[in-house]
Amino acid sequence: MIFNLPIADIQHKDTIFEDDFSNNVAGWETIEDEDEKACIEKKHYFMENKTESRWMFYHKELQKGFPKNFVINTEIEILDYKGYGQFGLVWGFSKPHHVLNRFVISAEADRFTVSRFEKNHSRTFHRFSGGYEKSTPGSQKCFLSLMLIEDYYYFFLHEYSRPVYICHQSHLHSEGNRFGFYVEPGIIIRAKNIKVQRIITKPGFDSRAWMPLGSELINGR
């Protein structure tokens, strides 16, 4: 089960998109060729990047657009990888998808990256990388959550009660309403679920960067 985020200063969360991949009513891309494979299989969204140098992404549009405050969270399991590479979430881009935001973790090391970049990687507008500790060493299951609340992004991994990174919304400008998964060469993953929720903050929230306390975490596992 996906972990719930800390709820300090949050009055209500309203689910606007949720998929457990029991079917493909949502219309995720399905494909199989010499470069990639993507399919709904055994209540998971399976994604394989067979190339040696080209990243892949699998995405859809949030029909009514992202609200002012929102959270995206997902559970992803890495099945195999060759060499090094990253996988995770992409969001905030349009159909031409020239510029994207991503929140990804490394396949071979306990590291993560948050960045805004051009599709061809010729230019990176914002980038931050850091390390983290898995709650269960050796586990192949990864829990990622990204939240935008009153102009600040918060990024969570696994059971951390505190975000691994915080930045102002201006660093990760949104170009559109598409979101989905990112997979680099040689990596095979499957997603168990993904959820997007609208967040309503409590009256009087002062909009400053908020650092949640450990006691405010609700573990949804």
Regions found by a protein language model. Give the residues of each.
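Extracellular carbohydrate-recognition regions
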Residues: I2-E32, K202-G220
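Beta-strand-rich interaction surfaces with strong enrichment in secreted/lumenal proteins
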Residues: P6, F57-G65, S129-T136, H168-Q169, ...
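Extracellular beta-strand elements of beta-rich domains used
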Residues: F21, A191-I199
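Carbohydrate-binding surfaces in secreted/extracellular proteins
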Residues: F21, T74, T136-Q169
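Short carbohydrate-recognition loop motifs
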Residues: E36-M56
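Secretory/extracellular carbohydrate-interaction modules
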Residues: N49-K119
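Short, aromatic/His-centered strand-loop micro-motif at the edge of beta-sheets
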Residues: N120-S145
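Flexible glycan-contacting loops in extracellular carbohydrate-active proteins
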Residues: Y165-K192
